[in-house]
A protein has these predicted regions:
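Conserved small/polar residues in nucleotide/adenosyl-binding loops
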Residues: 128-135
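Short Asp/Glu-rich motifs
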Residues: 25, 52, 126-127
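Short catalytic-loop micro-motif centered on adjacent basic/acidic residues
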Residues: 15-16, 46, 113-116
């Protein structure tokens, strides 16, 4: 499939089956995120894969999950990201967006649908990036 066809195929899916994402497909999606370009190749992205029932229930406290069996939370370490010297712009948000887009297109190439969710409670998501996640 050519790139434009792939880009047109990807859409914001809001209804999912309970079928688990195969590990090989998930690995391909995560690899697409790993090789995504980032400012000065700093790779500030941090990915949290959520697949367990308990994890998805915890995630539901942060945002609506639309019944998806798997979620990838894309975060970025601002201390690791490149900063533009002229105005001090830290591009961690841009890097995270590029990584997310690469993974979503990889998923589409594997016939998996995705949804980019930006409507979430940041304080609730901290549970996934702190020691509290282990409690």
């Amino acid at each position: 499939m050519d790139f434009l066809s792939l880009a047109k195929k990807r859409y914001a899916c809001r209804k999912y089956t309970a079928q688990k994402v195969e590990q090989a497909k998930l690995d391909t999606i995560l690899e697409a995120g790993r090789v995504a370009p980032t400012g000065a190749n700093r790779q500030p992205q941090r990915l949290v894969v959520v697949q367990s029932k308990e994890g998805m229930e915890r995630l539901a406290r942060c945002t609506r999950d639309f019944g998806a069996p798997t979620a990838v939370i894309v975060c970025a370490d601002t201390s690791e990201a490149w900063t533009r010297k002229y105005d001090g712009k830290n591009i961690s948000d841009i890097d995270a967006s590029i990584v997310t887009d690469h993974m979503m297109l990889a998923a589409a190439s594997l016939n998996l649908d995705t949804l980019w969710i930006c409507m979430f409670k940041p304080e609730a998501c901290l549970l996934y990036t702190s020691d509290a996640a282990d409690d």
